[in-house]
A protein has these predicted regions:
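Loop/turn elements at helix/coil->beta-strand transitions in domains of secreted/extracellular proteins
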Residues: 136-138, 179
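N-terminal amphipathic, basic-rich helices that act as targeting or association modules
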Residues: 1-99
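Amphipathic alpha-helical transducer elements in NTP-driven molecular machines
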Residues: 26, 119-126, 163, 195
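Hydrophobic alpha-helical segments characteristic of transmembrane helices
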Residues: 55, 132-136, 143
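Conserved catalytic cores of soluble enzyme domains
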Residues: 143-225
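Short beta-strand segments at enzyme active-site cores
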Residues: 105-106, 138-144
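Glycine-rich active-site/cofactor-binding loop and its immediate structural neighborhood
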Residues: 85-130, 134-135
């Protein structure tokens, strides 16, 4: 077999220009990833911690085997959308190891609009479920969500890959005997309550976790008039 020799000249001006351009792109990517990893604004993160809660990435670190890798899925989902109000689409998804077994982890980020679902949050959740279905990965849901982001509910529900498909996928996984375990870690309403309700096992954190179809303000018809 013929050997393909490189003709790149690392001392040429063109090489230096291309290298500088690529390094700038890599630096920009790393900056975007770092910003998305922070989650919501500082005020929201401090309020979350003041309630005695772990930040979502700390929850994942505590769950996974010490020192094991975490393959994150779509960390830049919703980047540049919604006036950058939903970093990472408000949910962390990825594959990690629990007792040496690969699992799909989905963790709502309550520091981002109370963990509510923007349209891209739904798409990211669905993509993670597709990966779990295709690879028969057990799912661990770290739930801390107020359900759909109501100001954008007209974009959350109307298409084929809408909010309701999350629960359809859960039913399909249940039928396929793919384990689903949920931990309710905050005030979870509407869609945030359905996910743990449709899981095989659910753990509710004492003095933190609650489930409800909706809150009193949403149930008050006067709020909609």
């Amino acid at each position: 077999m013929e050997t393909l020799a490189s003709r790149i000249d690392p001392t040429s001006p063109a090489f230096a220009e291309n290298e500088a351009a690529q390094r700038a792109l890599v630096a920009d990517l790393r900056q975007r990833l770092a910003v998305a990893a922070l989650g919501g604004p500082e005020k929201s993160r401090q309020r979350h911690l003041a309630r005695g809660k772990l930040l979502p990435r700390d929850r994942i670190d505590t769950l996974l085997d010490p020192g094991s890798p975490f393959l994150e899925i779509a960390p830049l989902a919703a980047n540049g959308l919604y006036q950058d109000a939903s970093p990472g689409a408000g949910i962390i998804a990825g594959i990690g190891l629990v007792h040496g077994r690969p699992v799909l982890v989905l963790s709502n980020d309550a520091t981002v609009k109370g963990g509510t679902y923007y349209p891209m949050t739904v798409k990211k959740h669905l993509r993670a479920q597709e990966i779990a279905l295709e690879n028969r990965l057990p799912c661990v849901y770290l739930v801390d969500s107020g359900g759909a982001f109501l100001p954008m509910q007209d974009d959350v529900f109307p298409d084929r890959d809408h909010f309701g498909r999350i629960f359809s996928n859960q039913a399909r996984m249940s039928a396929a005997k793919i384990p689903q375990i949920a931990s309710v870690m905050g005030s979870c309403t509407a869609g945030g309550a359905y996910v743990p309700a449709m899981s095989d096992e659910t753990v509710i954190v004492r003095n933190q976790g609650t489930q409800a179809i909706c809150g009193i303000p949403a149930a008050d018809i006067r709020a909609w008039l």
